[in-house]
Amino acid sequence: MGDYDESGKSLSNLTNIAVADDGRFAVLDSVYSRIFVYSSDGNLMYEFGGSGNAEGKLNSPVGICFMDEKVLVVDLAYQSVEVFAPTEYGHLINQGLEAQSRYDYDEAAGYWQQVLDINNNFYYANLGLGKFWSKRNRVRQNVHRLPLQYLSG
């Protein structure tokens, strides 16, 4: 946090954190105007934002908070509150996390499968399905569905 590269430019400055009801948390990087959203156990789920004048970009973000699935960002330069709604992909991830936070692995599995239909390399969705299969005592019957790299530790 707050490190510099060889030229003296700041690599990142993590200035604010918000926590959602389901345990997700968002971290604001004020140098690059990016927001990183993590699961309650610290796995990066997705990121968004960036510097600029276009829609979805920020100039001088100073604060963030959750409002349901939306992330609100206070931008000092624009003197505004920018509202970011999740994409369909982000919505599915949020729903999977929310169901998992209630230990409803049956419901979460449906969301994780939809996430994998969009991005079959999303590690956390594979873990979520693994929790579902484990909960259902079907690991031996379904272990062939998990990619090998996720089975070795």
Task: For each feature predicted by the language model, list its residue ranges.
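Hydrophobic/aromatic packing residues within the alpha-helices of TPR/SEL1-like helical repeat arrays
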Residues: W112, L146-P147
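Structural marker of alpha-solenoid helical repeat scaffolds
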Residues: I118, L151-S152
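Alpha-helical positions within canonical tetratricopeptide repeat
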Residues: E107, R140-N142
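Heptad-repeat amphipathic alpha-helical coiled-coil interaction surface used
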Residues: L129, Q149-Y150
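Short coil/turn linking the two alpha-helices of tandem helical-hairpin repeats
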Residues: K135-N137
